[in-house]
């Protein structure tokens, strides 16, 4: 009888890994190796071999993993929640859930740096910006930030840069702000020497000490204040005013821009995004036109393509960290694009009337609730409110909380004498009557119908919104499910994501986001929990986070993990803050020098600056490695002030630097700590561990190495791992044992997407994770070897091998043919590919990272495209193709151009079908090459009129 494998362990590994066994061996043979172990042994430096401490179980099957995580999710208790405080239940419209959130065309896309293949999500983001601009009454809005609290911190530093009160280091923050926002403000302010003064704005007599102010609108306790006079006073004192505003409330309230606010920030969570135990959610940031060049975050703008037709792109990128480094407006790289797009489509689907109707329903239910509570003898502290009430409940407060929880209801905990209630989109008449029952104490409940008939708005007449909202046709057209479904399909068809093609972006790790990993994200057991719910209700999340932290410790060799940072940039920041606090705890406050190699990603110096450190750049040698002697000299020179080294490993040049242990030793010998940037961890899991070869702290990108999708530019998760001496300095939170050092609004950051990483690790197991790293290295070296005859590979290790990515040097081709790296990137679109990373870390190069998920067939398809492009460049070099009018200079080619008058000296077929395989399935870019200069010189960051597309 044939032996049958009755087990299901490790089944998923072959689903995640691209190359089949025969292909894998052929690729190894092309490199001169007979096994993955031999290749790994040759790539990994001797000094760090054997440092991996990965001791995980076998991988679970997809069915078993889903069953296990379903059991974990079931331990979370779903109470009816009225906690509010910036987080509200809402309904995610089913067509948005099915056609956007659960659609890989949307969630597997990358940040839209290549505009020609990103027009769909750029349009969705432009809708988001228009939504924010309309509701806040300010003309410029960005394409999202990480959460409301970090947006408030960005507003604070924004005010500091722009305020004319240059001698001031004090920032006023209203005591009516959400407490989690105040905590993050304090964290961000301290390293920058900013003093956050928290007070009651109604009692503020002297505003002259402040460079800026943050006001909450409506207030966290529910009050709606008129800030006009106060704003004028701040402006008279040369201070700027930021307003944290509730988007749904702004459909009914006078917008901040109309009462003089300089900045509006807040969260778009209640526009269709689940609570998710705190995230991910899209924050917003809008401001006056005069301040646009100092805005943080991405900004979508309208430009034109080479045919003069409207086209969208990311505008004013010179503000950002990848260009300005330590002088950037922010260190933020990943934002919250997927969540911003959900909020955008929520507004598109409901339109201005629908949003206003939801807001009016919420407000009137709150008014009915308040009237009923008053009739029951409960003191309601607010007379003007939108959706939130503070109740003076005195000695009964604790008993009322207990009574509510016994009925599976959460009320907001304020103090021993008061509690809070926030009504939301999901609240019903039955809910209001149940709430009355909590407070009735045997009294007859009020008559809902009678109170509803008499209910009136409590918003003061002076604050009732008069200006229209969302008048653009996009918000007034797609209100049936059929229309919205087709609109989302039309937008998705304009873009390239992993559902169509590999995305070989170096330093980005665009690997498979498996369907089984994604499924738990939409479960109510994970999505419907409030981040400030009592701990006993989140036992499932506690188990999930405990297990995930242990898994990540095993993968990295660190002793402790914090899952709070909600982006890689925030992980970097939290890591440097831990180092800073460690030095301070030892009485070494003077240590503020951060050494950073010249090859580092721009987030590194931008983050060091935010953490109050001075950046000293160290040199790299001709092979792309850190110049150890220059590093040693600078470490010794600054030994009394040395705080840290930030180094990426494997390096941003795509190689395992052989001197990494020596590098770490130099820093430690001179009193510093070593921050190993984990952006390239996909080459190390199961092979070597940064916590075991000299790292004191690293951040990980769960949206790279551990399979959380990029979402078109977010969400991301950037947890940090630390050695035990830094554990006391990990981020805290007001709802955790350690209160200090919060870097984002929620205790566990983007908690609701952590199941993705849990699923990936449990299904891959220890052997699968190691194999993934080995295949990532194999695929990169296979591409490097296939293309090295056509393009110089800029950096390799001493054995001629790369790590998990390779850099092709196109600079000689610019000299010989006039063809630029940009031309090659755009020509790849005609072949159906997203371009590799352009001009980073070296100008004029392409950095390619294929990941382990791509098959040999797909790798060959990409290599064939690159080789054919080299042939076209050669034709330009020898004069066969015109140096100005050729397929590369004119790429990408659109269908409209193909059927129009053809004036080029090369054929239509050469333009759009340069290889025969494209005939089977062709991606058509919706626009020609986008004019970046025009877009920045003629900045438009809201939906243009329909006529402009004519």
Curated annotation (Swiss-Prot):
Catalysed conversion reaction: N(6)-[(R)-lipoyl]-L-lysyl-[glycine-cleavage complex H protein] + glycine + H(+) = N(6)-[(R)-S(8)-aminomethyldihydrolipoyl]-L-lysyl-[glycine-cleavage complex H protein] + CO2
EC class (word): oxidoreductase
Biological process, per Gene Ontology: glycine decarboxylation via glycine cleavage system
A GO-annotated cellular component: cytosol
Database matches in SUPFAM superfamilies: PLP-dependent transferases
InterPro entries with a match to the protein in the record: GcvP, GDC-P_C, GDC-P_N, GDC_P, PyrdxlP-dep_Trfase, PyrdxlP-dep_Trfase_major, PyrdxlP-dep_Trfase_small
Known cofactor(s): pyridoxal 5'-phosphate
One Pfam match: GcvP2_C
Modified residues (N6-(pyridoxal phosphate)lysine): 704
Stored NCBIfam families: gcvP, PRK04366.1
Functional note: The glycine cleavage system catalyzes the degradation of glycine. The P protein binds the alpha-amino group of glycine through its pyridoxal phosphate cofactor; CO(2) is released and the remaining methylamine moiety is then transferred to the lipoamide cofactor of the H protein.
Family: Belongs to the GcvP family.
The protein's name in its UniProt record: Glycine dehydrogenase (decarboxylating) 1
């Amino acid at each position: 009888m044939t032996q049958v494998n009755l087990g299901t362990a490790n089944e998923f590994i072959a689903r995640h890994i691209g190359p089949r066994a025969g292909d894998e061996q052929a690729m190894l043979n092309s490199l001169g190796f007979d096994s993955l172990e031999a290749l790994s042994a040759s790539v990994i430096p001797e000094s760090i071999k054997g440092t991996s401490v990965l001791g995980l179980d076998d991988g679970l099957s997809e069915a078993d993993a889903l069953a296990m995580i379903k059991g974990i999710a079931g331990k979370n208790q779903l109470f009816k929640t009225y906690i509010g405080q910036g987080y509200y239940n809402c309904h995610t419209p089913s067509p948005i859930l099915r056609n956007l959130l659960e659609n890989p065309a949307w969630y597997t896309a990358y940040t839209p740096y290549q505009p020609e293949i990103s027009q769909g999500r750029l349009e969705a983001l432009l809708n988001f910006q228009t939504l924010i601009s309309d509701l806040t009454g300010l003309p410029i809005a960005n394409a999202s930030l990480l959460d409301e609290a970090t947006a408030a911190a960005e507003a604070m530093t924004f005010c500091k840069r722009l305020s004319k009160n240059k001698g001031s280091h004090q920032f006023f923050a209203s005591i009516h702000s959400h407490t989690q926002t105040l905590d993050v403000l304090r964290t961000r302010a301290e390293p920058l020497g900013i003093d956050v003064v928290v007070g009651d704005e109604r009692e503020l007599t002297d505003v002259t000490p402040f460079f800026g102010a943050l006001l909450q609108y409506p207030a966290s306790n529910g009050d709606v204040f008129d800030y006009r006079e106060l704003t004028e006073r701040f402006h008279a004192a040369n201070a700027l005013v930021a307003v944290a505003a509730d988007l749904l409330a702004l459909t009914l309230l006078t917008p901040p821009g109309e009462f003089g606010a300089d900045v509006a920030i807040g969260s778009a969570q209640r526009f269709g995004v689940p609570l998710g135990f705190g995230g991910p959610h899209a924050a917003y940031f809008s401001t006056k036109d005069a301040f646009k060049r100092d805005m943080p975050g991405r900004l979508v703008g309208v430009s034109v393509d080479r045919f003069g037709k409207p086209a969208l792109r990311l505008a004013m990128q010179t503000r950002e960290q990848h260009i300005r480094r330590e002088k950037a407006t922010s260190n933020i790289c990943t934002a919250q694009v997927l969540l911003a797009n959900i909020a955008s489509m929520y507004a598109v689907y409901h339109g201005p009337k629908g949003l206003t109707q939801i807001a009016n329903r919420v407000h009137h239910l709150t008014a009915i609730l308040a009237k009923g509570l008053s009739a029951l003898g409960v003191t309601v502290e607010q007379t003007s409110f939108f959706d939130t009430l503070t109740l003076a409940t005195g000695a009964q407060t604790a008993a009322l909380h207990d009574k509510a929880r016994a009925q599976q209801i959460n009320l907001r905990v304020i103090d021993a004498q008061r509690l809070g209630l926030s009504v939301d989109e999901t609240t019903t008449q039955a809910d209001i009557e149940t709430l009355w029952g909590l407070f009735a104490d045997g009294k007859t409940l009020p008559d809902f119908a009678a109170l509803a008939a008499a209910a009136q708005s409590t918003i003061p007449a002076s604050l009732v919104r008069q200006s229209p909202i969302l008048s653009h046709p996009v918000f007034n057209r797609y209100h049936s499910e059929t229309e919205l479904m087709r609109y989302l399909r039309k937008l998705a068809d304009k873009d390239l994501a992993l559902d169509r093609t590999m995305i070989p972006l170096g330093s980005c790790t665009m690997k498979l986001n498996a369907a089984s990993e994604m499924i738990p994200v939409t479960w109510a057991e994970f999505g419907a929990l409030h981040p400030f719910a009592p701990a006993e209700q989140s036992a499932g999340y506690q188990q999930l986070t405990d297990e995930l932290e242990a898994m990540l410790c095993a993968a990295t060799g660190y002793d402790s993990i914090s899952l709070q940072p909600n982006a890689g940039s925030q992980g970097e920041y939290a890591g440097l803050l831990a180092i800073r606090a460690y030095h301070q705890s030892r009485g070494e406050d003077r240590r503020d020098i951060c050494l950073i190699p010249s090859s580092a990603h721009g987030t590194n110096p931008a983050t060091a600056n935010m953490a109050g450190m001075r950046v000293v750049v160290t040199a790299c040698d001709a092979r792309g490695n850190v110049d150890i002697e220059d590093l040693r000299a600078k470490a010794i020179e600054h030994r009394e002030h040395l705080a840290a080294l930030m180094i990426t490993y494997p390096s941003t040049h795509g190689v395992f630097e052989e001197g990494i242990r020596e590098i770490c030793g130099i820093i430690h010998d001179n009193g510093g700590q070593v921050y190993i940037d984990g952006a390239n961890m996909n080459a190390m899991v199961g092979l070597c561990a940064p916590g075991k070869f000299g790292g004191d702290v690293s951040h990980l990108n769960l949206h790279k190495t551990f399979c959380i999708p990029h979402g078109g530019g977010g969400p991301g998760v950037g947890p940090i791992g630390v050695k035990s001496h830094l554990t006391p300095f990990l981020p805290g939170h007001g709802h955790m044992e350690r209160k200090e050092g919060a870097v984002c609004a929620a205790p566990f950051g983007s908690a609701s997407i952590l199941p993705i990483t849990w699923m990936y690790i449990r299904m891959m197991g220890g052997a699968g994770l190691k194999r993934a790293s080995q295949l990532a290295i194999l695929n990169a070296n296979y591409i490097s070897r296939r293309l090295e005859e056509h393009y110089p590979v800029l950096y390799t290790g001493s054995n001629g091998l790369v790590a998990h990515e390779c850099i092709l040097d196109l600079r000689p081709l610019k000299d010989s043919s006039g063809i630029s790296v940009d031309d090659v990137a755009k020509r790849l679109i005609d072949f159906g590919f997203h371009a590799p990373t352009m001009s980073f870390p070296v100008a004029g190069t392409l950095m390619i990272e294929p990941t382990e998920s791509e098959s040999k067939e797909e790798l060959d398809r990409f290599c064939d495209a690159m080789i054919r492009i080299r042939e076209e460049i050669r034709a330009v070099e020898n004069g066969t193709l015109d140096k100005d009018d050729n397929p590369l200079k004119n790429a990408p080619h659109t269908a409209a151009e193909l059927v129009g008058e053809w004036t080029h000296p090369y054929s239509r077929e050469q333009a759009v079908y340069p290889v025969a395989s494209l005939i089977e399935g062709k991606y058509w870019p919706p626009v020609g090459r986008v004019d970046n200069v025009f877009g920045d010189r003629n900045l438009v960051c809201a939906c243009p009129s329909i006529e402009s597309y004519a």
